[in-house]
UniProtKB/Swiss-Prot annotation:
Enzyme Commission identifier(s): 3.4.22.-
Active site per UniProt: C150, H287, N308
Organism: Arabidopsis thaliana
GO cellular component: endoplasmic reticulum
Motif (Prevents secretion from ER): 361-364
Residue span(s) of the pro-peptide: 21-125
Protein name (Swiss-Prot/TrEMBL): KDEL-tailed cysteine endopeptidase CEP3
Underlying gene: CEP3
Tree of life domain: Eukaryota
Residues listed as glycosylation sites in the UniProt record: N122
Length: 364
């Protein structure tokens, strides 16, 4: 009975956090009312701020609330909300949550690697809509927290997806292993790319489960993988989607979740709530996400279903629908510029029990 109430309380807390936080115009009429709104928002999101920061945070909150209010009064296909990012500046948001400079990491890494092929090149027909969540190939939305590990979350989500598709087994995998251990070309909480992460998983014989190597958002980069037993999920390699081509990207997403990089640094993206995102964003790729489907609204607006790693309270339960099929080849927010996916051709079970190496045992 005690366990039941603990589970119930946890569920209700999550439900409350994921619900929208609404306000009306009367709460914006005076500074006193906005202060009360800010206090209500802090309670809703369990936000604690140091006393010396109170004025600064309130002013930032007021600015963001007014932006949300003005934007939502316009006739746009998406809405904003005062989510948990509402009292941080645009610069702070970019630094903490959209600061993985893909161009910088690409320059350090050099030319793209992989198999050199695109297995979906000859696909001629795809379904009008696909949602890998409905097919059971997507785990629950996760939260990278204050760590620039989006690349690890994007990589893991794509691997979880293809593993489910090939083996009919959905296993939540370890982002923390990538943060701690994939350090030759990626930089933990300082950012990275999905491609070398796919290579790491292949070359190291797979990746641990989240259960055995849980996420803690730390960036000490002390690799514990060799001292942990349990299941390991493997892949065969990875491929790239031809860049700047949404039609080719569509072929890939029709067959599996695909890792992509986007420009997620705009104020509207920071405060996104629901709808098809057509807001301002460039092609300065700074955030790794994964496309888990696509579709079209009743009024004919095409979109990608994109899974983020900022927790379920952001956006549409942790997801954003981004406009698809625009005139620019790069796609909205550069979504077609850096797309890749893991390959796994075998339909045999992909998990195996790993053992602690003898040399590691000796050290324990």
């Amino acid at each position: 009975m005690k366990l039941f109430f603990i589970v119930l309380i946890s569920f209700l807390s999550l439900l409350q956090a994921s619900k929208g936080f609404d306000f009306d115009e009367k709460e914006l009429e005076t500074e006193e009312n906005v202060w009360k709104l800010y206090e209500r928002w802090r309670g809703h999101h369990s936000v604690s701020r140091a006393s010396h920061e109170a004025i600064k945070r309130f002013n930032v909150f007021r600015h963001n609330v007014l932006h949300v209010h003005r934007t939502n009064k316009k006739n746009k296909p998406y809405k904003l909300k005062i989510n948990r990012f509402a009292d941080i500046t645009h610069h702070e948001f970019r630094s903490s949550y959209a600061g993985s400079n893909v161009k910088h990491h690409r320059m350090l890494r050099g030319p793209k690697r992989g198999s050199g092929g695109f297995m979906y090149e000859n696909v001629t027909r795809v379904p009008s809509s696909v949602d890998w969540r409905e097919k059971g190939a997507v785990t629950e939305v996760k939260n990278q927290q204050d760590c620039g590990s989006c690349w690890a979350f994007s990589t893991v989500a794509a691997v979880e997806g293809i593993n489910k598709i090939r083996t009919n087994k959905l296993v939540s995998l370890s982002e923390q292993e990538l943060v701690d251990c994939d350090t030759e070309e990626n930089q933990g909480c300082a950012g990275g790319l999905m491609e070398p992460a796919f290579e790491f998983i292949k070359n190291n014989g797979g990746i641990k489960t989240e259960e055995t190597y849980p996420y803690d958002s730390s960036d000490v980069q002390f690799c514990r993988a060799n001292s942990i037993g349990g299941e390991t999920v493997t892949i065969d390699g990875h491929e790239h989607v031809p860049e700047n081509d949404e039609e080719e990207l569509l072929k890939a997403v029709a067959h599996q979740p695909v890792s992509v990089a986007i420009d997620a640094g705009s104020s509207d993206f920071q405060l996104y709530s629901e709808g098809v995102f057509i807001g301002e964003c460039g092609t300065q790729l700074n955030h790794g996400v994964v496309i888990v489907g696509y579709g079209e609204t009743k009024n004919g607006t095409k979109y990608w279903i994109v899974r983020n790693s900022w927790g379920p309270e952001w956006g549409e339960g942790g997801y954003v629908r981004i406009e698809r099929g625009i005139s620019e080849n790069e796609g909205r927010c550069g979504i077609a510029m850096e797309a890749s996916y893991p390959t796994k051709l075998s339909s045999t079970p992909s998990t195996h029990e790993s053992v602690v190496r003898d040399d590691v045992k000796d050290e324990l």
